[in-house]
């Protein structure tokens, strides 16, 4: 059941759609504006090959269609991939979701998952898109080139790919209950949170469910567009821009009898990378340095010790609002 008092506003209200085929300076300005105002936008004409997208989606569908015992067997210890069902993190958060989680830099899964080729091609494509968006961001902010993209280009980058499958309601309630008016078919598939990494590049099938929180604290439903990628600012990018960009709070709901599939690339830096406000961002903004300097490993450890909805960045502020 969906809880909370936040009001839901119209679908796609104020969500920027950025055409990556436009003139470069125009694209960079639009990205900066979107990151400042909402921390979320869609990109079209992004250059990711449709064959790569389709292969990834079909192989994911094939995997989640397997019997439960086969899927649950993909939970090896100390491996860069795993299957999960309902459990989100290690602190009691749960949702109406099953997922596959891959560490993008370790090839150990290649011989064990039948769709490894599709996964590898997809990772390379969205990683390149993330780097391009981050370089355009740096240009729009007038900070040194590759200030952001260098962190995810390293061979040691701690990026992950997560494939979420939100099954139809009858798998949770049973077909007999679907006609019961007292049973709400709208559930929280993945609870309210921000992403701790630098940037997230997400694509979903034609089924809705994603919502983002705007500056008024209202939920904006994002219409599904399989031809576009959704991009959102993560906690680390908010820190590096000294709070100029917004790490947007978002969640996923499940509706009715349709199955939703989403694939998210979380662009993260190496564990030892030092993260803090860029000097150029502190000098150009009329406010003090808002965040301490820390390593991604330190932040990741602290962040994952909290619940999904907790405000992780508060632990690393240098001054209180």
Swiss-Prot record:
Residues 156-269 form the Fe2OG dioxygenase domain. Induction: Not regulated by auxin. Down-regulated by paclobutrazol. Fe cation binds at residues 193, 195, 250. GO terms for biological process: gibberellin biosynthetic process; gibberellin catabolic process. Transmembrane segments: none annotated. It is an enzyme of class 1 (oxidoreductase). The keyword Iron-sulfur does not apply. Keywords: Dioxygenase, Iron, Metal-binding, Oxidoreductase. The keyword Secreted does not apply. Pathway: Plant hormone biosynthesis; gibberellin biosynthesis. InterPro entries: DIOX_N, IPNS-like_FE2OG_OXY, IPNS-like_sf, Iron_ascorbate_oxido_reductase, Oxoglu/Fe-dep_dioxygenase_dom. One of its GO terms (molecular function) is metal ion binding. Catalyzes the 2-beta-hydroxylation of several biologically active gibberellins, leading to the homeostatic regulation of their endogenous level. Catabolism of gibberellins (GAs) plays a central role in plant development. Converts GA9/GA20 to GA51/GA29 and GA4/GA1 to GA34/GA8. This is Gibberellin 2-beta-dioxygenase 4. It comes from Arabidopsis thaliana.
């Amino acid at each position: 059941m969906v809880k909370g008092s936040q009001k839901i506003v119209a679908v796609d209200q104020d969500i920027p759609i950025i055409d990556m085929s436009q003139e470069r300076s125009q694209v960079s300005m639009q990205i900066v504006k979107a990151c400042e105002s909402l921390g979320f936008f869609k990109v079209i004409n992004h250059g990711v090959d449709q064959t790569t997208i389709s292969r990834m989606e079909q192989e994911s569908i094939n995997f989640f269609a397997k019997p439960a015992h086969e899927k649950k067997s993909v939970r090896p210890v100390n491996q860069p991939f795993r299957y999960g069902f309902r459990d989100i993190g290690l602190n009691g958060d749960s949702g109406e979701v099953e997922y596959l989680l891959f560490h993008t830099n370790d090839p150990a899964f290649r011989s064990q998952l039948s769709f490894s080729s599709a996964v590898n091609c997809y990772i390379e494509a969205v990683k390149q898109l993330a780097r391009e968006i981050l370089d355009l961001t740096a240009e729009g902010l007038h900070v040194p080139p590759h200030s952001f993209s260098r962190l995810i280009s390293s061979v040691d980058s701690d990026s992950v790919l997560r494939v979420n499958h939100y099954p139809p309601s009858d798998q949770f309630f049973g077909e007999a209950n679907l006609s019961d008016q007292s049973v709400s078919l709208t559930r929280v598939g993945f609870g309210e949170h921000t992403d701790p990494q630098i940037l997230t590049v997400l694509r979903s099938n034609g089924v809705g469910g994603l919502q983002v929180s705007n500056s008024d604290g209202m939920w904006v439903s994002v219409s599904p567009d399989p031809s576009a990628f959704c991009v959102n600012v993560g906690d680390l990018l908010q820190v590096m821009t000294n709070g100029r960009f917004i790490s947007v709070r978002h969640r996923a709901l499940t509706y009715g009898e349709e199955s939703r599939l989403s694939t998210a690339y979380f662009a993260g830096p190496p564990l030892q990378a030092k993260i803090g406000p860029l000097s150029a961002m502190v000098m150009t903004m009329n406010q003090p340095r808002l965040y301490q300097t820390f390593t991604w490993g330190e932040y990741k450890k602290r962040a994952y010790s909290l619940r999904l909805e907790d405000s992780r960045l508060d632990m690393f502020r240098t001054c209180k609002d």
